[in-house]
Amino acid sequence: MKQALRVAFGFLILWASVLHAEVRIVIDSGVDSGRPIGVVPFQWAGPGAAPEDIGGIVAADLRNSGKFNPLDRARLPQQPGSAQEVQPAAWSALGIDAVVVGQVTPNPDGSYNVAYQLVDTGGAPGTVLAQNSYKVNKQWLRYAGHTASDEVFEKLTGIKGAFRTRIAYVVQTNGGQFPYELRVSDYDGYNQFVVHRSPQPLMSPAWSPDGSKLAYVTFESGRSALVIQTLANGAVRQVASFPRHNGAPAFSPDGSKLAFALSKTGSLNLYVMDLASGQIRQVTDGRSNNTEPTWFPDSQNLAFTSDQAGRPQVYKVNINGGAPQRITWEGSQNQDADVSSDGKFMVMVSSNGGQQHIAKQDLATGGVQVLSSTFLDETPSLAPNGTMVIYSSSQGMGSVLNLVSTDGRFKARLPATDGQVKFPAWSPYL
């Protein structure tokens, strides 16, 4: 774990230009429906003020998941510095059955020890459900906080935490030599940096399953092209630059293939490239437009958008052959799906009655639940644990990023201050 904390994102920081973060999570609704939990400010054992509010990071992570409602600090019945100091009755009286406490200690070599304990207030005093400690340098303190959040979240829900993940997105600003930027940040908007700047539009970033590369669309050559960029060194590999449209890249879960849409023969159709050999094969054909592929977990089947029935709907096709099967039936049109990592559901843009929102469809039953309530919602991307969706929506004359939990109860915004933000893509586990 300590080794992971030191190197997990080192390859990114080596070359990337780090920016002052422009994106922060702003809670809109739903936090009150989460499970109450206590997160105490971590005890600082050094001089002056603590270099980072680790307890605040943990509380924010748990709140952002939509599954927890951390008690406001002003209402904490006590501020224990260790598990032994937790008084169960004081917390149980507030309906809280779990409390996170922690300590941050400076080391002579300039590093820090970060420790936490998850305390069960329903058991004997000092009963610890989970605990860990990490030795990190100052720049990794936030990462240590996210690590603690992941472990607490998994212990209490049985679901792997996704707080150490990242998001990629495109920012468009007005004026300047490079008005389009592909950026990456922590899932909560911190530690933002630029992957690529361009005078021409950038679109549709997609993560490789190991998190080391991004595929995206660029127009820098005068027409659309698909490229894959390695984050560690910035190396760019051009994948496709055929006449007309090249777009909608999607890595297969096993990392061996890239699906995308081309219109080199007229209509948009799906193609799959074997990344080792570079060989491309066509998956769909016909006069309809077929685009926006997303993989099922088996790396053999795709969900995609097609207008073969008139309006856009989501279909499923095996890349080895066979006729596509329509899988969306509710609403006037459905498109731009993202299938969950377990293959049990997908999120998509669903339009009905003049409204365009993010919806979730159970792939076994076909049941659909509308998740969002913002305006002109598009490009949904699932967190790797399937608990949250990031998407873009229109606000005023521009576009912003939004979060919604996949149960629809929790909603938040990630407002940007320096431009329109589009095409969000949630990373795999890192």
Swiss-Prot record:
The keyword Cell cycle applies. SUPFAM superfamilies: TolB, N-terminal domain, Tricorn protease N-terminal domain. Residues 1-21 form the signal peptide. GO terms for molecular function: protein domain specific binding; protein-containing complex binding. It is found in: Periplasm. It holds the Pfam family TolB_N. Belongs to the TolB family. This is Tol-Pal system protein TolB. The gene is tolB.
